[in-house]
């Protein structure tokens, strides 16, 4: 089976803050952008941050209040460990720290 890249657009309230978080703290390469949106290479997929309102609620999973909407990437063990340690070292305030299910 061939995995095909996906496009995911999410709302943000500040493009510069999104650029700092996704680009600098998470290390995603910035692609195209405009005044109201910016896209990033999310492990070969396209993550686009658009200025817009967010609707948020949570659902209990593994005893944690998991925000909805949310998204993630499935990594092998070594990639997960490396990425997890990298983002933990960037002083990010997590809603839920990276963990394995």
Q: Can you name each region flagged by the protein language model?
A:
Residues 3-7, 66-70:
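Short, solvent-exposed beta-strand edge segments and adjacent coil->beta transition regions
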Residues 27-32, 94-97:
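Short secondary-structure junctions
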Residues 14-29:
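Amphipathic alpha-helical segments
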Residues 15-16, 71-101:
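Vicinal oxygen chelate
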């Amino acid at each position: 089976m061939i995995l095909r890249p996906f496009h995911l657009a999410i709302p943000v309230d500040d493009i510069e803050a999104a650029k700092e978080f996704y680009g600098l703290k998470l290390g995603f390469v910035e692609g195209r952008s405009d005044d109201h949106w910016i896209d990033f290479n999310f492990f070969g997929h396209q993550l686009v941050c658009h200025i817009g309102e967010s609707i948020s609620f949570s659902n209990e999973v593994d005893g944690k209040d998991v925000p909805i909407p949310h998204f993630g990437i499935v990594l092998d063990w070594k990639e997960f460990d490396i990425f997890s340690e990298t983002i933990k070292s960037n002083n990010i305030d997590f809603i839920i720290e990276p963990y394995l299910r």
